[in-house]
Amino acid sequence: MKKRISSIFCLLALAIISIQAKDYNVKDYGAIGDGKTLDHIAINATIDTCVAHGGGRVVLPAGTYLCGSIRMKSNVELHLMTGSKILAAPASMKAYDEAEEFEGTAYQDGGHTYFKNSLIYAIRANDVSITGRGMIDGEGLTR
């Protein structure tokens, strides 16, 4: 009986360990973090990989990540390590997703809403977070 209980606890411990969220380092997916190279494509690829494996933590180590639209998805924590910065790309770089067509009067300007045309956004997502001691610098981004 004691062996059976011990076996059950071991299996339970292994199950808990296997479902813990995994870290995905954006540099492993091509991000440079030099403040000159557009890194949102690599960050979005990291988020997609994270989601494909059930979610987890997308980690930005120290560096400056020049970015257009970052698309957050369910079960993803975007974690900015100390010394990391997401820096909004200038609008002239055309690195942002297209604004949505008019879908009502809320949050619209000139026939467009601006959820997708943002630095960081999520649509129909849950369990999304941005954590850490890094910085997000919108640079006074305008459309």
Stretches found by the model and what they are:
Residues I19-R143:
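Extracellular/periplasmic carbohydrate-active domains that bind, remodel
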Residues M1-D23:
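Bacterial Sec-dependent N-terminal signal peptides
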